[in-house]
Amino acid sequence: MNALPSSAEFSRAVGGDAVSREAVIRIEHLSKTFSDAAGPVLDDVSLTIRRGEIHGIIGRSGAGKSTLVRCINLLERPSAGRVIVSGREITSLRGRALRNARRDIGMIFQHFNVLSSHTVAGNVALPFKVAGLPRAEIARRIPPLLELVGLAHKADAYPSELSGGQKQRVGIARALALDPSVLLCDEATSALDPETTDQILALLRDINRKLGLTIVLITHEMHVVRDIATRVAVLDHGRVVEEGATFDVLAFPKSAVARSFLSGLVAHELPPPVAAQLLPAAVPGSDPVLRIVFTGTAAHDPIVADLVSVFGIQPNILHGRIDYVGDRPLGVLTLVAGGAGEKLPAVLSHLSSLGLVVEVIGHAVRSAVARRHSAAR
């Protein structure tokens, strides 16, 4: 492996405006149909992944995530459409040309695929041997890889002596052996416990920063996307239903699929017993229910106290949470604006002027919601 770039070199490589807009992977109108499937597994998927991004692709089981990532390096050949990686149309290649192109695309999997009969160093050496590198060159290049993934002290260990996280580190080192510019991660943390998952995500983030590596991360776990991805695409029934900066998708999800993934992570959705009490329109004795999204410094402002002191509102908090996406705070608060009445337009205008995103999501008879909310707790 080449020497790691300095921070200045890495900044020039992935930080400039011109380069950061460069598309490393372009997926154009991609479709895939299997002979035994009722319909297309992928249906007219288009996606652009830029240099240095960690791009998450999330979806339910069967959404087509793994098929999509396997089409990027042509482990699965698409039925229609194009995949372009680093300026080369991968889908037009076969034989030796395809094998050479794949050297620029590393891949790790949910199951670690380490050979039990080989040591850690022996497993990492495999891509070098397939590429025909001399033995001395292989011996020179293995130690920096093991150092990068935190396994320098395990070079002579066998897989039976390793934890699951250490086996995945072997997989990462092996995937990076031929200096790829792209790393595909297909459910790479799904078989790991939460603590080990966090460690592997931290390693991937570190590798992304040090090497300027573009990472495509397939997962069904939104917290993985929250913790590491710069952008995210939401896949459902073989189609991209939403795509954007991770913070924007988490803060302002547009699709029902994204909102369902966020239900345990960001408080966009009310608990079902409370949601069941909401009315679609105002009735006598009801109050508006507001969902307020806080971002940046507004996530820490005393908004509820402000509503009481400025407008005399009697707020009843139904649900809320503050989380962090990267280093940016994101809060979602749902409350009944008790006594808002004719003051509601002024309340909404005031909250908007503070940089908050606010919407009326329904109405509620306060006493009924309070009773049900108390029971739900």
From Swiss-Prot:
InterPro entries attached to this UniProt entry: AAA+_ATPase, ABC_transporter-like_ATP-bd, ABC_transporter-like_CS, ACT-like_dom_sf, MetN_ABC, MetN_ABC_transporter-like, NIL_domain, P-loop_NTPase
Domain annotation ABC transporter: ranges: 25-262
Recorded superkingdom: Bacteria
EC top class named in words: translocase
GO molecular function: ABC-type D-methionine transporter activity; ATP binding; ATP hydrolysis activity
Binding-site residues for ATP, renumbered to this chain: G59, R60, S61, G62, A63, G64, K65, S66
E.C. designation(s): 7.4.2.11
Main location (coarse class): membrane
Self-association and partners: The complex is composed of two ATP-binding proteins (MetN), two transmembrane proteins (MetI) and a solute-binding protein (MetQ).
Family: Belongs to the ABC transporter superfamily. Methionine importer (TC 3.A.1.24) family.
Function: Part of the ABC transporter complex MetNIQ involved in methionine import. Responsible for energy coupling to the transport system.
Protein name as catalogued: Methionine import ATP-binding protein MetN 2
Organism whose genome encodes this protein: Rhodopseudomonas palustris (strain ATCC BAA-98 / CGA009)
Lineage of producing organism: Bacteria, Pseudomonadati, Pseudomonadota, Alphaproteobacteria, Hyphomicrobiales
Gene behind this protein: metN2
